Amino acid sequence: MSDDKGTYDPKEGCSDWFVLEAECSDASLDGDLEKLFEEGTDTDISDLIDNEDTVQGNSRELLCQQESEESEQQIHWLKRKYISSQEVLQLSPRLQCISISPQHKSKRRLFEQDSGLELSFNEAQDFTQQTLEVPATDVVPQGAKGLGIVKDLLKCNNVKAMLLAKFKEAFGVGFMELTRQYKSSKTCCRDWVLTVYAVQDELLESSKQLLIQHCAYIWLHQIPPMCLYLLCFNVGKSRETVLRLLTNLLQVSEIQIIAEPPKLRSTLSALFWYKGSMNPNVYAHGEYPEWIMTQTMINHQTAEATQFDLSTMVQYAYDNELSEEAEIAWHYAKLADTDANARAFLQHNSQARLVKDCAIMVRHYRRGEMKEMSMSSWIHKKLLVVEGEGHWSDIVKFVRYQDINFIQFLDSFKSFLHNTPKKSCMLIYGPPDTGKSMFTMSLIKVLKGKVLSFANYKSTFWLQPVADTKIALIDDVTYVCWDYIDQYLRNALDGGVVCLDMKHRAPCQIRFPPLMLTSNIDIMKEERYKYLRSRVQAFAFPHKFPFDSDNNPQFKLTDQSWKSFFERLWRQLELSDQEDEGDDGYSQRTFQCTTRESNGHL
């Protein structure tokens, strides 16, 4: 066989089939060409080209359908965190058990649940890596959003710690650095600081207007998901009341709110609220609270620099007739909002000593004033403070009701008020329920006298109150008390000077003031008290005190009745005219124990 035409020298690396070459037959090729030309250009295939008019069809509907599917797919990816798949939920426990790399506990990430902001950011970054297509399910209703937030909070072991951490992350300052803690939810306070978690913007805006009727000052700043309130209410409210109000206005649960009163004496806290109100993102309504202005305004800081003046405090206690330490401390502390000296008193470290010194000085001034005044001046001064109208006839009718000659009683009462020797002690005796104590107590009350109790007779100081009064009373004198009076108080009833033992002081020389006694014993018939008969003026009350059908006393022994009695019988009692003693139409200058101010009136 002859060699075929073509390349026979194969290159290294080629397979053997490249050696073979096709063989051509000239005879067969010539026959095929002749046959081809004889048949011509006719073909057996019919209707290969369609020359009819085209129809539009539903291409537009198809385009709209494709765009709608694409839009739904985009929305689906945006809302994928709200969509749950039953299949994924069933597979999730198994998938969680499968782990390629070892798991490490994160110490910095304290909370798994979040408001949605950070999780959404992380999901947006991992969007390209997501390969699992979650089938679409029903979207959670909007009304169930708040319930889901509460459920997320309930999953936390410490809800308050979570809210405090989110607050500090949002505002850059700790919530407890701005507030002081109230352990009881029933303690009332005017000012409250509140932080609320995950509030809808519409409800937050509406609360600005709804809180105006409740608050004098509103401070609101929102940094999602937290918002911060400073509410200064018109009246004091407890934490329970504040939470009830905010839950109704903001449609949130109490677990989403932390409420505490602000720090009133912290300069840093006051500056936080003051500087924050200048932020355009902060809503502020009303005037600044006093505790903010005090620590931020220059004029208030200058006022606080004022030193405490004890004489001003003594003058206040004297003018308001406060002599007890507790009353002085309580009433003067309440003036701190308006009085600079009272504010300086609260800032002083020795408040107890100042109150004690003030009470001592007031008693000294009162005692000196009383010693200088006569009985007429004393009665006139005490009657000036009695308000209202009464009738002197109630006193007269009651004395006559007890079968007492009123002229004789008036004469003895005149000697009693003038502290006449051997006539300065008046005894009212009789059976029980005759009005003895009611009659004498009403007189002691209107003249601001002192009541002595024989129950303290074992103490050597039980008679000390007589040194600070113009009239005294010993109620319900028994045989034991009569024996004591007969043994130790004869000189006192004579009207002479006696030595009275005073607590924490040296014994003083005084004369006993007019002394009234009530008793169920008639000493005029007791032989063993014969030495007291000449020293005591006795009047019997034999009849029981009458009451009407409504159980009201028929004789009104009130301050107004005694005021009318003294004014009506002033001359008969031989009380001196106040014009003779210098009281001409209240023109006398009142007592002043403070130094006159440089800008004071002349």
Swiss-Prot record:
Broad class of enzyme this protein falls into: isomerase
Region span, DNA-binding region: 142-305
Similarity remark: Belongs to the papillomaviridae E1 protein family.
Biological processes per GO annotation: DNA replication
UniProt protein name: Replication protein E1
Gene source species: Human papillomavirus 15
Ranges for domain SF3 helicase: 404-554
InterPro entries tied to this protein: Helicase_SF3_DNA-vir, P-loop_NTPase, PPV_DNA_helicase_E1_C, PPV_DNA_helicase_E1_N, PPV_E1_DBD, PPV_E1_DBD_sf, Rep_E1_papillomaV, Znf_lg_T-Ag_D1_dom_sf
Residues bearing PTM Phosphoserine: 85, 92
One GO molecular-function entry: ATP binding
Motif range (Nuclear export signal): 91-100
PROSITE patterns, A to Z: SF3_HELICASE_1
Cellular localisation: Host nucleus
Modification note: Phosphorylated.
Subunit structure: Can form hexamers. Interacts with E2 protein; this interaction increases E1 DNA binding specificity. Interacts with host DNA polymerase subunit POLA2. Interacts with host single stranded DNA-binding protein RPA1. Interacts with host TOP1; this interaction stimulates the enzymatic activity of TOP1.
GO cellular component: host cell nucleus
Function statement: ATP-dependent DNA 3'-5' helicase required for initiation of viral DNA replication. It forms a complex with the viral E2 protein. The E1-E2 complex binds to the replication origin which contains binding sites for both proteins. During the initial step, a dimer of E1 interacts with a dimer of protein E2 leading to a complex that binds the viral origin of replication with high specificity. Then, a second dimer of E1 displaces the E2 dimer in an ATP-dependent manner to form the E1 tetramer.
Keyword DNA-binding in annotation: yes
Gene that this polypeptide is encoded by: E1
Keyword line: ATP-binding, DNA replication, DNA-binding, Early protein, Helicase, Host nucleus, Hydrolase, Isomerase, Nucleotide-binding, Phosphoprotein
Catalytic activity as recorded in UniProt: Couples ATP hydrolysis with the unwinding of duplex DNA by translocating in the 3'-5' direction; ATP + H2O = ADP + phosphate + H(+)
Gene3D superfamilies for the chain: 3.40.1310.10, P-loop containing nucleotide triphosphate hydrolases, Zinc finger, large T-antigen D1 domain
EC id: 5.6.2.4
Binding residues for ATP: 430-437
Residue stretches spanning the membrane: none
Intervals of motif Nuclear localization signal: 79-81
